[in-house]
Amino acid sequence: MSLFLCLIAGILAFGIPAKADQWLCGPSFGSVNARGSDVRSIPIRLAKPETVDALIATSRPDILWRLADIAFVPEFEDAALSAMQNGASAITDLLAYDQTPDFAGRHLADMRDGFGQLWQEKLLEAGLVMLLPETGRPIDALLAAEQSAMSQQIGLWAPGQSPAYHYAGSSEIDGDLPDAARAVGRFAVIDGILQRIEDREWRSYLNFGSDWRNDFTVMVDRDLRDAIKTAGQHMEDWIGHKIRVRGMIEDRGGPYLELTNPASLCVEQSVGQP
């Protein structure tokens, strides 16, 4: 059989992989510079990690580092630490974003291997961590890595994972995601189709169902609403499209999320594009 026929047979047998979801995320919703393009790269050699969130470079053992824009979850922290211990020797450089340490004395940074891939990407692709935007830096590559793990349903995104971290904010979402009402009290990722927007002087409510008293709602305060508009986005254009948000889910009659970081809200790629 020719190579061409073999390829056709393989496609028929296994199907064509579905295209991963593409997103536009705040605060810029698409117009971004390359992550770390304005930060000097520092060559490093890492000590073998003893914990996931207190990393040490052998040249400066007095400084603790934490990987930026990701969060470790309890159920997968041991697996993440094992992966980091196995991969630490491949890390060759560091991008330090803030000279001010956090409450635990750690500095936020990106770390990359010799091929230029972020360590955070590798952990996200394996489904061992969650994306948690916090630096204001572009998250496109990190979001794509997390989406890959979601699409493959691996790690913390696996079906039946308890507790779940990915929920449906509206009935129109395809698949078997649990309802957002089950996410109350947890930090979670919620996908939903935006139904309508209620604007008030100091805030806007993004409603993902016909009854705001019971359905999933996202609150956007006036400052964030203005920032979204400044970025060239009109929230009314999002109606009927898939939205992804992440944060702590509260119970306000129905599941409710107060948006605190525009990077925690993403919209289908088609929105706002020519």
Role assignments for model-derived ranges:
Residues 19-274:
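Small beta-barrel nucleic-acid-binding modules, primarily SNase/OB-fold domains
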